[in-house]
Amino acid sequence: MNSSELKGYLTGLMFGDGHIDKGVTKRAFAIKSIDKNFISKIKNDLESCTNFDISVKYVSPHFSCGCNHKEYWELRVKASPYFNKKYHHFYDDYKKRYASKEALSWITPNGIANWYMSDGYICHVGKTSGVIRDRRIEFCTDRYSMNTICLMRDMLLKRFNINTSLIKRGKFYRIRVSKSSYEDFINLIRPFIVDTMRYKLYLAYEQQPEWMSDDMWNYQKSLLSAITPSGKAGG
């Protein structure tokens, strides 16, 4: 990756579960995932184009704060001036998450894929009852303000031609990809999705919908082996 591609790549991680610490002249970056392959991909990608000091830690399943926690892997990049320069594009003056206009212009298809692997999910509505009535591709944006979420939606439309809608989950709002953009969205990110997260691209249609191209239908059939029991985000 060149420097622009690296910015776009990391921006996607930051829009998801990535975070930058509170250093002064240098800041560290970290991201966690229950998918080992996703963390390994990030490590390999960053090592191929940077001199970042990277470490990965495994945390076994455990009980704390009244909850059972799944095993996960955490990737950390040792404090670097690089992240100090990027910090204020992802945190406001009150240290709350947001996305600057510059950050929204940085993100790439690879970055969108990182964002989706980290904080995106597909829901097959009705699956537990045996009949899937609907499909929903969504980004969990609970940590962001309405203004930032709207800017993210605008970015997806203007830069990648991805139509979305805004949905409410409790007191938070999330981004839902419109059915008219399912195919464009999947084609945009599928080259970058790790095999163990390909289930997030599976729409679970038993018959080819009229709107779906033959190429996408064949791809969907190839994803069948990648389905997991959970429709939740694996990031």
What residues fall within each predicted segment?
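Internal intein/HINT superfamily modules and their associated LAGLIDADG
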Residues: 1-235
